[in-house]
Amino acid sequence: MAKEFKQHTGLAVPLDASHVDTDAIIPKQFLQKVTRVGFGAHLFHEWRFLDDEGKQPNPDFVLNFPRYQGASILLARENFGCGSSREHAPWALDDYGIRAIIAPSFADIFYGNSLNNQMLPVRLSEEEVDELFKYVEANEGATITVDLEAQTVSANGKTYHFEIDSFRRHCLLNGLDNIGLTLQHEEKIADYESKIPAFLR
């Protein structure tokens, strides 16, 4: 069964960049894996590391700052996840430990892929996202709460509302991926299959 997402409070890391594409999120040389595990080690590889092997962390990249270690909420700017449609991008973010991404806008395919992989992309206005950036950057250890049931983001005593498709919300709240959705109708499927003539089975 997929992971449920109801409410999450976590340390937020501010990635102050617009139009972050999927090749930056997970470069093409790391796409050979056939399972979802292990991509987190290569997340933002070209930015996080100074060498090709990934052994020399770039001290100037925000995800490497000591204050943001263990972050589970990513703040980003507009058009996050643009570029190719590789599903490995949300796999890498999820494997790294990111549970929610907050940005003014997302590339459509990335947005859908994230939801399909039980990671919540939250769209807020540019002004609201900018407020969150300023709060997180000014307060070490700042956390943000994302409440999918209430469709709110809370931080620094303020609450922001976001919209999400009701079907997508239902799937996340109940931990339902495509297989889980199918299994909700398991009895009906079994009943239908039992009525199929033997020569058609």
From Swiss-Prot:
InterPro entries named among the record's database cross-references:
3-IsopropMal_deHydase_ssu, Aconitase/3IPM_dehydase_swvl, AconitaseA/IPMdHydase_ssu_swvl, IPMI_Swivel, LeuD
Query: One of this protein's GO BP terms?
Result: L-leucine biosynthetic process
The enzyme's E.C. designation: 4.2.1.33
Pathway, according to UniProt? Amino-acid biosynthesis; L-leucine biosynthesis; L-leucine from 3-methyl-2-oxobutanoate: step 2/4
In alphabetical order, the GO MF annotations are: 3-isopropylmalate dehydratase activity
First-tier enzyme category under EC: lyase
Q: Which reaction does it catalyse?
A: (2R,3S)-3-isopropylmalate = (2S)-2-isopropylmalate
Q: Mind listing the UniProt keywords for this protein, alphabetically?
A: Amino-acid biosynthesis, Branched-chain amino acid biosynthesis, Leucine biosynthesis, Lyase
What is one GO cellular-component annotation here? 3-isopropylmalate dehydratase complex
What's the stated role of this polypeptide?
Catalyzes the isomerization between 2-isopropylmalate and 3-isopropylmalate, via the formation of 2-isopropylmaleate.
Similarity-based family: Belongs to the LeuD family. LeuD type 1 subfamily.
Alphabetized PANTHER family for the sequence: 3-ISOPROPYLMALATE DEHYDRATASE SMALL SUBUNIT, 3-ISOPROPYLMALATE DEHYDRATASE SMALL SUBUNIT 2-RELATED-RELATED
Its quaternary organisation is:
Heterodimer of LeuC and LeuD.
Protein name (record): 3-isopropylmalate dehydratase small subunit
Natural source organism: Glaesserella parasuis serovar 5 (strain SH0165) (Haemophilus parasuis)
Provide the organism lineage as a comma list: Bacteria, Pseudomonadati, Pseudomonadota, Gammaproteobacteria, Pasteurellales
